[in-house]
């Protein structure tokens, strides 16, 4: 065995050990739990809670935005519903005008037009300041909700310490060859990771596509807006860090389905994956020092950061061995193939869907595209080039009652706030 072959085999063996421990704990904690909402001792609502839906939008495709808003308007929910669409300085606003006007006729819809792009956080906060509902549902403008999402996400009791997220799926119908892979990726992220994390009341990544919080927890958006990593502000660091700071739990509801649009070209797809990779590293690194993090969540933090690096190292040394010696690292390659087949078989059995056997083909995308991308993401965690240069604003608006459309103006620089502590989860 050459040094490169040994190094590659050791790296992939460590990855296999870490992955086995992680997946085993996932299997254990995916079992039904006896913990119920009633155990927290708070009574029920006297009536259905009111829900405010916040939809930030920037340069969205008019058809996609229309489908998103139509899915919200068609929700099967008997309580009061108010929708706040905030256009974050879109450059295609003229193309979106017909969509804005069509939904502005619905008294439940409020359309806010920001004169300049201020970033997703600030756009959300503009609506949060106006929100008065019991619950706040954040929905991305490229997401289409099932008709019963709000009904399933709204808690059936008045417990304040709960946030909930639904299950994401790929586009329906599948338009691109890669769409089935995207759909399976969403299923794995929701049902392998978030469902187990929810057992401890601390979902580590709450996608903005479909997440609901109590209004009292939405007051933590000031801390969310001021989260720092390496003394810099980042727009995509997850809200759960500030949400959990106030001892609020976050749960996962797999029956609440939301379909989201996925990139249909390689460039946008890699850009999305790069943003997600940076977000994963930043958020898990912020969560790593927590003293009360239980064993599973600590392993989750370690696995999210260390696992891809070990696999990266194994692949790079294997390629170097092939280039320098002309021999292939067969042992490392066989271990990767065996782990892939085993994982996909277990998932197919658990999901009762044979399509997950075909997810083995995604390994090539993962190894040759996503792993180098994750390594690059780790080396560029401080990169903020994609964020808007306008970070803060002051609420100043004029309203037109007929169209229920608000033009927002006046900008200012917000004072810097200290970074908040991170999430603490209790062991079960």
Swiss-Prot record:
Compartmental location: Cell membrane
InterPro entries attached to this UniProt entry: Glyco_trans_2-like, Nucleotide-diphossugar_trans
GO annotation terms (biological process): extracellular matrix assembly; hyaluronan biosynthetic process
GO molecular function terms attached to this record: hyaluronan synthase activity
Record's bilayer topology term: Peripheral membrane protein
Broad class of where this protein is predominantly found: membrane
Entry's Gene Ontology cellular component terms: plasma membrane
A matching Pfam family: Glycos_transf_2
Keywords associated with the record: Cell membrane, Glycosyltransferase, Membrane, Nodulation, Plasmid, Transferase
EC number: 2.4.1.-
Taxonomic superkingdom: Bacteria
Function: Involved in the synthesis of Nod factor, a sulfated N-acyl-beta-1,4-tetrasaccharide of N-acetylglucosamine which initiates a series of events in the host plant species leading eventually to nodulation.
Family statement: Belongs to the NodC/HAS family.
Name under which the protein is recorded: N-acetylglucosaminyltransferase
UniProt lineage: Bacteria, Pseudomonadati, Pseudomonadota, Alphaproteobacteria, Hyphomicrobiales
